[in-house]
Amino acid sequence: MSNSYSSNAQKKVISTSEWDDKLAEVNISKSDLNKLVMNYLVIEGYQEAAAKFQEESSTQTTVDLASIADRMAIRSAIQCGDVEKGIEIVNDLNPEILDTNPQLYFHLQQQKLIELIRKGMTAEALKFAQDELAPQGEENNKFLEELEKTISLLVFEDTAKSPLSSLLDHSQRQKTAGELNSAILLSQSQDKDPKLPTILKLLKWAQTQLDSKCIYPKITNTVTGEYE
């Protein structure tokens, strides 16, 4: 089969038929694809969809699907500012997660302090910092620095004017919830992030590399797999 070239910088042109022939030579098992889908559903927390997919495809997972609901409840609690509830659920799920991860535990306590500051509960925030966080800071300089930054929010009558006001943003809750979610997944021998988005990023990168070398049937719709 001969290759053709375009007049645009003499780029190699690959026809759709040639491309399809090459794709046909790639062997991807249905089982591997099913595992990829299950990986995404479990990690992203789609419990009902994962259970239905498991039933229909007979794809097994090492995770108890019932635990997905607990993990989502924990993430939701942290994102809503109810740190105590999140800690309670994770301890019921697996107390070793926090017992073996002092940094995670500190960040949860730090988030609890942030929530007290957000509510304007200055006296309670100072007492909580002194009783719960200061002892951890004495044993870890990094924790102490983070505690001092958090407490500095109280210097400003209007916390929104603090250089560290980002600690009060919803993104900080999401960051803490994400750290805890990753720890739970790790305890269940799961990836902390689903594989599918990474594969799609690799696809985009590979197509960018090809764009400079040839003209080919480029995928423009990753949902349907349609070429341009």
Curated annotation (Swiss-Prot):
Query: At the top level of its lineage, which domain of life is listed?
Result: Eukaryota
**Keywords of this entry:** Cytoplasm, Nucleus, Wnt signaling pathway
Q: Which residues form the CTLH domain?
A: 67-124
Q: Which InterPro entries match?
A: CRA_dom, CTLH/CRA, CTLH_C, LisH, Ubq-SigPath_Reg
The LisH domain extends over: 29-61
An annotated GO cellular component: cytoplasm
Q: What family name appears in the similarity comment? A: Belongs to the GID8 family.
Function (record text): Core component of the CTLH E3 ubiquitin-protein ligase complex that mediates ubiquitination and subsequent proteasomal degradation of target proteins. Acts as a positive regulator of Wnt signaling pathway by promoting beta-catenin (CTNNB1) nuclear accumulation.
Q: What is this protein called?
A: Glucose-induced degradation protein 8 homolog
Species in which this protein is naturally found: Dictyostelium discoideum
